[in-house]
């Protein structure tokens, strides 16, 4: 009986030891949940991203020593070095390395000369394993920022129920069946201080300026003040829709 008990305790102990390294494996997709939570408060989108960014998602594979991230407009490929005293170093071609560590259930990107300290959570979004880098963050952001039911208060389709889906579809908004939020890059440069999104119906689409204030979402035509040979500089024109989020 004592031998059986001893063997059982040994098995439990060894099992615990064997599983310990798995808890230190940072493989997987990590998203900037802090940026999403800030955006979900219903204010300016890019302000929330900039305040908690700049990086939005990490995709890490310790087996292949790959660690890639996106900041919303570029994908950066890195090489993951073995853990050293709780720190994983990621090296990049032509750029300074970045250090990562774990703090509880968070992946921490250590502050550097180029970037502030950032925290990331494992993505719970269910997507295909080959989903493009950044897709997990975008799905989670769209659900948090534009999820739920909206009602057209004014504009074409007044009274319609509008739904923005996480995969980029929009239902109930006349003249559009797909949308994309501008997170960073050229679209952000073109819209300057304003938040913008792309609305599309089948093959035809256009940029729009939007203003989010709590439960209200205003969508405006995007007018261009730039000269023909300059990068577009968008600003809000006529308001096309006023939407209100339903409780």
List where the protein language model places each region:
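Positively charged n-region of N-terminal signal peptides that target proteins for export
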Residues: 1-4
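Hydrophobic, ordered structural segments
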Residues: 97-121
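Edge beta-strand at a domain terminus
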Residues: 112-147, 178-179, 224-247
């Amino acid at each position: 009986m004592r031998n059986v008990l001893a063997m059982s305790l040994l098995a439990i102990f060894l099992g615990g030891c064997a599983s310990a390294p798995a808890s230190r494996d940072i493989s997987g997709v990590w998203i900037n949940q802090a940026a999403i939570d800030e955006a979900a408060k219903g204010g300016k989108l890019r302000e929330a991203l900039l305040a908690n960014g700049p990086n939005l998602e990490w995709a890490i594979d310790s087996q292949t020593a790959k660690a890639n991230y996106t900041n919303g407009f570029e994908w950066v490929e890195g090489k993951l070095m073995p853990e050293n005293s709780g720190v994983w170093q990621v090296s990049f071609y032509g750029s300074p390395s970045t250090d990562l560590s774990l703090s509880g259930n968070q992946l921490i990107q250590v502050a550097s000369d180029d970037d502030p300290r950032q925290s990331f959570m494992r993505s719970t979004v269910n997507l295909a394993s080959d989903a493009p880098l950044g897709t997990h963050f975008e799905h989670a952001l769209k659900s948090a920022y534009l999820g739920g039911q909206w009602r057209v208060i004014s504009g074409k389709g007044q009274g319609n129920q509008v739904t923005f889906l996480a995969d980029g579809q929009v239902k109930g908004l006349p003249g559009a069946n797909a949308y994309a939020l501008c997170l960073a890059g050229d679209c952000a440069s073109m819209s300057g201080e304003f938040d913008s999104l792309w609305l599309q119906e089948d093959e035809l689409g256009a940029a729009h300026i939007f203003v989010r204030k709590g439960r209200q979402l205003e969508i405006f035509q995007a007018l261009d003040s730039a000269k023909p040979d300059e990068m577009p500089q968008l600003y809000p024109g006529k308001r096309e829709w006023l939407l209100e989020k339903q409780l």
